[in-house]
């Protein structure tokens, strides 16, 4: 374990060009973080040395770009201890990740009378998509009651989750209160009634080790920009068997093996439809990987 004295004495500002060059005390990290030099340099390095379209071409630069793309997924897989890199979906942010689950999984699996359980402290990105999906499917949104201090008890979770519950959606850490919520209990309660658990880790991933296998979350979402990475990159983790069964959220290139004029003979590859439609800004993936390693090293040092 790294002691508090060592953590406090380290000059963290030198890693961040904006902070090192200015007399600034930046305290808005829950909204977005400043970027360390390694992230900025990785972005610049990509444009200088590797810029090409991944997953398509067979020439050297395209192959390098593809390697960078796939290496980024492996890096995130290791960061959250997913079973496979195929369980890592790159999105634009946590909001898009949660909407992907709500609209792809939710619309396909909810029916009238089903219940979606969440909390009143959720970020709107983990509340409004469920309300909108409930309106379209006839499902009902229920809220786990919070105590006056903002805490959530095991009893409150048990009272909210019933045999009608199909989805339990909860933030691991509240973006308003900063509270660490009992997601282990929420996930366990969901699985006891056959529901899936959706975890918003936007505020927890930057500050604590995430182990999706240990927590047994079905889906988990977070953003790069809240954990020293670039804006425009988010992550959705989903258990492979759930992703394989979900209909496409968006459609486009690299998600289909062939297509006919009338569409009747088209062959959609479901897993590919999530992580290969269109192109994420590859340079952001490159810098996000650098950030991922930077953040991972810090968390590992603190844990050790």
Please state what every model-predicted region is.
Residues 1-304:
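Pyridoxal 5′-phosphate
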